[in-house]
């Protein structure tokens, strides 16, 4: 099933998930078993038009962004700043020891665990997301606020295995951004900090892609931290959408970033729709509401109660109201940075200092002088009339318009295919299947409530048959004990549904799917267990009563005597408690829902790094070379001459012979745009150099000395600040030649090399509709080869894809810092910023 999106339109974030993820949660993660018919022809045209308009407005406000929407992919240790010099993000690859992430993953996977039953009931792959640590629970129906999450409460012993990862992450945060770490550390209440860190809460996500959002509820004067704990995948980079940059992350990588900037995940880079992949990530943050007065008063109330009960295990004697700062939950202001290959390289931490100052100077020069950019790289940063952007209809949508949320009237749709699907899945509510997900106590409540209702239905049916032996339809008495037993059974079923979805807010389409299966299960039980005739109860009757339950149940409750109202409330609480005590990942059972104990920090224990022979968090953070002041300071101005070497492919004696180009829509897209036509008509850009000389030619541009040389030529033993290898690898063959080429020219760069190449992959390769992708693949190599041959006068051309080029860079002993994509380039040009690997 193709990727879909769960659309959640609400004013407030669902606090069972990371606050601020309030508009979309993508599928690959959320798939509805009934999505293909829930919004079918039963919706009239006017309603569909209104729903479509609302859907499109929501998509505009909170879209998904793909990799092609961003100009830069950061891979190495990176400090990215906005135009005012404020740090927006710090990427640190391989930041965490693998043993720490492995230990934490073993525990935190349980926080997002879903059983196979959930997928069986609703189809697809479960959206796995959960919270750990402490949470305020405001805006949720949970009565007791400002406390441990249920996961932490139920996994006290296992929780300790997360502490090394917490310590390493906190130490990295402190080393990189010490001022913000101190502010956050000073604000977080001691009762809710996780293991002495400035974090109160973790959000754990598995197989999760987010749309553009800001994190509502995070501490304004701090940074959030994202770490990938485990996984096998490509793509899903964290993108800062207003800045056009992505941070590529793999297991053990850490990203410190301003969570109040709009950010999202790019697409999964897997061409097969059913590709196997997994990714477990963790967000560390301080939930600012935990430091506000209502929560502080709750801590004090619990402490006072514990003292009155003469508790002997108190971890605190008093609660301090700290300065929590001003937390507006507003998006951060955006100060865009014009992006060039030089500004991209200047963000590399390895190039800080003198190199970054030079790169910043070069960035300013090419911004002021577009012809200098063309002189250096062969084309401008952006070509307005070049390779056209993909139209939306050419791309596989993340979402389906059929998922538009409609007004919900309770119950379920009675279309034929929906009823058939419900009947096919009714057995998932059988006792033996429920036991796979829920504890014995809750399954017993379900069984007892179900049996009680069926007994009352049987008794009523037998009475109706005695009165009228020819009766074929059951008559439902709304004032009978059977009706109240049905509502009680619905209360149990509702908790079953909440458990299956992990206590997150349930989409109305999912809810309809569930109630359809519930009704089919009961209708089948009426036939096979108490001997009613086919259709005597019927799906329609049960649907009517389910709508009555969803919209009329509270009215009946208010009409009941006070003592009956109280009994019903207690009953619902009893059901919820039983469901929450279901064993997940062998957790210890606990009465989390009613827990009022002052149990803050009771789970905390010290980690003995020396005894375990683990690197200390402080020493681990020192590996990255952050100065005492952190990464805040911007680089100074460059002085003196900057030397740049441009290496060009040597032209052959003649242009590639004109060949017959394919004719298709994709071929026309590549060959007939105005920029491509200019390349075909212009003189090759490397003809100006003398082909008879193997020596370099020097051009002076202010304090920039530019040498140009053909591949194979000599520079007389000189070293250069920067080397630009302009489309050299496309002129090499086999595996050995490109590696030798890379080794030779990158060795002449003091700081870094720009490897500029044609990328045969379409920028939307992984999300192109199959028919478009196939047509593109059939013509791309011959078309781009013709354009390259016209540009560089080459007979033989060997164009490659980004994955292939990255492999060459790695095998040649170089490290990739970033990739820059030239927007609209007729050659689909990319520039890789690489440097020699330190020995």
Curated annotation (Swiss-Prot):
Cellular compartments annotated: Nucleus
Residues carrying the site annotation Involved in J base recognition, conferring specificity towards J-DNA: 548
The protein's name: Thymine dioxygenase JBP1
CC cofactor note: Binds 1 Fe(2+) ion per subunit.
UniProt xrefs under InterPro entries: 2OGFeDO_JBP1/TET_oxygenase_dom, DB_JBP1, DB_JBP1_sf
Gene this chain is encoded by: JBP1
Enzyme class: oxidoreductase
Oxidoreductase as UniProt keyword: yes
Amino-acid positions noted as binding Fe cation in the UniProt annotation, renumbered to this chain: 213, 215, 263
Family: Belongs to the TET family. JBP1 subfamily.
Start and end residues of each stretch annotated as Thymine dioxygenase: 86-288
